[in-house]
Amino acid sequence: MLREENDRLKGQITTNSIAKEQLQQLLQLVGIPFVGDTPVVHTRVVSGTLGNFGDRLELDKGSSSGIERNMPVVTGEGLIGKVVEVAENRCIVSLLSSGTFKVGFSVVGTAAIGIAQGNGGENSLRGANIDSRQAVSVGAITATSGLAGSPFPPNLPIGTVTAVRTNEAALESTVDITMFANLNDLVYADVVLWKPAG
């Protein structure tokens, strides 16, 4: 009898812990400062983020909520991907960690810009095409560059530089970036209703 009560209490603690984590994710989406006045659609993840997952997830909102292809998707921590397919009440998101996903980024506080690409399912990216004359250091913060033609607005947080490699002959540096957003077990995400000008 005591063992059954102990097991029941352990189950309740686990359930409460999961609920607390989901609440924390939801609270992070309230008033995300880096999207400014751009409207967002709050969504719930309906498939694709259980543990070590692939490179896509499905959200419970679609075109009826104003969502269109190529719109950025964020959590309270930063950019996680972009919308690649849209139905009336669902959309599919390609995650930033995907090996096929590319995003223009800038290193905050410097003039350094580059292109980051996912490593295929990890919470890390590889940044390339950085002018080696620009000083980039480990610990530097990266965000979307928002340069002309970019599918992303400027200043969406991406992650932190964890390694820098310089090829002096090519005048180019590459960096490793660890994403701010944890892509494991996502429950909520916001679609930023933003489209590039033109």
Where are these regions (language model features)?
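A secondary-structure micro-motif
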Residues: T14-I18, Q24-G198
